[in-house]
Amino acid sequence: MNSPNESDGMSGREPSLEILPRTSLHSIPVTVEVKPVLPRAMPSSMGGGGGGSPSPVELRGALVGSVDPTLREQLLQQELLALKQQQQLQKQLLFAEFQKQHDHLTRQHEVQLQKHLKQQQEMLAAKQQQEMLAAKRQQELEQQRQREQQRQEELEKQRLEQQLLILRNKEKSKESAIASTEVKLRLQEFLLSKSKEPTPGGLNHSLPQHPKCWGAHHASLDQSSPPQSGPPGTPPSYKLPLPGPYDSRDDFPLRKTASEPNLKVRSRLKQKVAERRSSPLLRRKDGTVISTFKKRAVEITGAGPGASSVCNSAPGSGPSSPNSSHSTIAENGFTGSVPNIPTEMLPQHRALPLDSSSNQFSLYTSPSLPNISLGLQATVTVTNSHLTASPKLSTQQEAERQALQSLRQGGTLTGKFMSTSSIPGCLLGVALEGDGSPHGHASLLQHVLLLEQARQQSTLIAVPLHGQSPLVTGERVATSMRTVGKLPRHRPLSRTQSSPLPQSPQALQQLVMQQQHQQFLEKQKQQQLQLGKILTKTGELPRQPTTHPEETEEELTEQQEALLGEGALTMPREGSTESESTQEDLEEEDEEEDGEEEEDCIQVKDEEGESGAEEGPDLEEPGAGYKKLFSDAQPLQPLQVYQAPLSLATVPHQALGRTQSSPAAPGGMKSPPDQPVKHLFTTGVVYDTFMLKHQCMCGNTHVHPEHAGRIQSTWSRLQETGLLSKCERIRGRKATLDEIQTVHSEYHTLLYGTSPLNRQKVDSKKLLGPISQKMYAVLPCGGIGVDSDTVWNEMHSSSAVRMAVGCLLELAFKVAAGELKNGFAIIRPPGHHAEESTAMGFCFFNSVAITAKLLQQKLNVGKVLIVDWDIHHGNGTQQAFYNDPSVLYISLHRYDNGNFFPGSGAPEEVGGGPGVGYNVNVAWIGGVDPPIGDVEYLTAFRTVVMPIAHEFSPDVVLVSAGFDAVEGHLSPLGGYSVTARCFGHLTRQLMTLAGGRVVLALEGGHDLTAICDASEACVSALLSVELQPLDEAVLQQKPNINAVATLEKVIEIQSKHWSCVQKFAAGLGRSLREAQAGETEEAETVSAMALLSVGAEQAQAAAAREHSPRPAEEPMEQEPAL
């Protein structure tokens, strides 16, 4: 092998592979193709048939045998290295090209993006410019409209000024104005009505003889009052026309013409009156009548022979009649001592202006129409004024005049005058009082106007017309000059001498008889109810709830009661001034309402020995009744069975008792001291139907979970099961505002504790409250409420919420005083969410918190335990006692880490200040998966509630018994699966505290079946009725994980304050059966240890006796010798 061949072979192998030129690389971005040159020449060369120069492959094949394998391997390696270098170079070129293209596209995208942003900015600027132009155009249009409106106003003003100028500059011969068609028709009707022949129908009264009283008192003809309507058979009358200014120079309301002088008009009208007035009694033209209750017949007599009645004054006694020293005559009216009725103006009456000079209450004084004075102030001198008698008096009127004159002289009514059919009782005192102050008419007018307004808003109330006004008969001077007297505040004022007398006394007498018959029926009904109470008492029949028929009209008549004072049956209060506080007025009104309830409703408890003076509870001095009650040993003989370790110095209410004057309880029939009431010391139940009236004004109970059916169904369930017959029915009352203010603020108390009528007497500044606090909101149902679910009824809710508080107070005080063993209050609305100044969650006043406060203040109760097992946390109760160590609050509620209403009640909330540790929150977590049930509640009572309660050792236990944790309530209002039977067992456990003084108050719970079942179970437990045992599955079940975690956290927090709960931390996961077995083993171990210790002591004592030296034997006695 020579070198040329080798070199040729080497050189021939080099160009075997051809790399694509660089120009082609730019067109191929990713892949590189390497292919051999002359691929088709290989078969020809291999065939050997062709000629030509050999290819490198052929040469390589020819040199295969001659080339060394080592050298061939080196050649191949060199070729591979060259290929790798070429490929690496191509990759670099491709990456550079890719980077270049990427940069180019990026720059292009940025340019497009900037162009797009620029277009958007231009469009936004154009839009803003269009809006500015539109606003500017709108502003210009508004300004143009305003200018147009001002121009129209100026034109109208100029037109009116021109018309006025034309009227001012008119000629005297032209008319100043043209009357409209309506005015002409009204004037024509008025003149036609005057031209008709009047018939007798009433007295014709007018103003006294004074120049100013004979003026035109109407600015127009349509100012007369509309006619009133009333029952048939009552005498017609007129109402007070609207007051109008008058000119004393005008004599009559009709306009004078230039052709008729004053004297001609006066003489012609007098002649017309004399011709057409055949009787002084005139009938109302429109034929309407008015009830006799609003029209009081008036018959005022003088005191001597020189004075007589006003009735049927002479028709011709007009202004031109001569005056004398004994007679000052007012046509169709009355003067003298009659206007001077002694009266005492109430504060609201004094607000009306009194101006005798201008006589703002002047009346229409047409000579042919009757004038109703309504007790206007007399303008003549009192010392020179007397009454003149009509020349013709009917027999009945003459008899009435003699009767009144006899009364004024100190005599008595005899014969047919005893019925007082024609003499109202309110006028008897008037007839006896004599002359009064000269301002009697004006003040009486103001009083009557306010009284009429109150009467239009209330129903007819029967008021006895005799036996109410104190008849003063001593030292009466029978002259027209009498000392000024005062009308007692309690005397009911009515329409006085302004009303005409009826044609005959039959109508008024019939009304009096109806009123007396109605009173007789009410009294008979009350006696029958009392008699039925005695008959059913021994038979253990269930007592029906006390109804309040008068409560339906209570709120509407409160304004009238305020005007009438304290009522006709009470003594007049001396020294009453208008400086009385608002609180005293409201409490006085509440006393009157409670007094009415005491008269009309059945007495619930028969505690003999009460005096007749103790008819109603005195809410102002709450301890007076119990002080007298506990001082009497005979009626409290049954109370010696149970001694309450409480101080009974003051009690805020008085026990109800039957008076000795009742026909059903004669004075000679007294139960012997050794015969106690059979079921006195038992469970008390309180319920009142007035709480049913708290409901939404929409009337749809389906959209409101808290409705009246809750307590109504509970009461019915207790009746059906017979449990109510085993209980003592306690009558409730309305809580006073002072009692409510022990927990709530004054603004909150007045806002939700007063009705719209008695709220008028409250200072408006007290009702303003915080500016940020809104009062009411409109609900989707159409009613109103304080929030989305707490409804409010403006007429009845205030009384209902106060009744709920008062019912619980009555029951709790009787239990604390030892009269009852325990109690269950069926009340609504609930109260444990109500805070000091906030109403929420169906709650307005916190009944349980108020009761706890008053038990401590009035009965000196030391420690109170409040257990709240409502599924919602009682945020209001916790707030009231958060810093109070004398009240222990334990709540079991659904918490869910603050995600369940109301969001409060975390386990870390343990109290503040001196009350740290006296607030225990068992706050369940985990939602309703799984739901909390009987096992969890019983475990909480076993490990937390009862140990802490026993260590606290309360005097009274109050339970906020909400039953919305009972199965049947959906998740928003409940969601747990506690059975009603479980709450009976929880109640039984609580009865081991405080000597059994446990009071349950109904709180939440909106499923009727659930709350009825739970209430039945709780009342059965309170009555010590054998309860249905728990299921074995419940006793074997273990608490769920969420409940165990909750109780572990509560024990960890509360163990710092109550060491008794520490020992239960280890056994939280055990079932009730296992826990009972463990406690039994522990108890047996303790007992065995105690027995062993006792046995050891006895053995030691025996051994000591054996080792001790025997005492010296005493010599035996010698027997006597036989």
UniProtKB/Swiss-Prot annotation:
The active site is at H833. Zn(2+) binds at C696, C698, H704, C781. Residues 328-340 have a biased composition (Polar residues). Its EC number is 3.5.1.98. Keywords: Acetylation, Chromatin regulator, Cytoplasm, Hydrolase, Isopeptide bond, Metal-binding, Nucleus, Phosphoprotein, Repressor, Transcription, Transcription regulation, Ubl conjugation, Zinc. The modification Phosphothreonine is found at T292. It holds the Pfam family Hist_deacetyl. Residues 684-1028 are annotated as: Histone deacetylase. Responsible for the deacetylation of lysine residues on the N-terminal part of the core histones (H2A, H2B, H3 and H4). Histone deacetylation gives a tag for epigenetic repression and plays an important role in transcriptional regulation, cell cycle progression and developmental events. Histone deacetylases act via the formation of large multiprotein complexes. Involved in muscle maturation by repressing transcription of myocyte enhancer MEF2C. During muscle differentiation, it shuttles into the cytoplasm, allowing the expression of myocyte enhancer factors. The nuclear export sequence mediates the shuttling between the nucleus and the cytoplasm. This is Histone deacetylase 5. The gene is HDAC5.
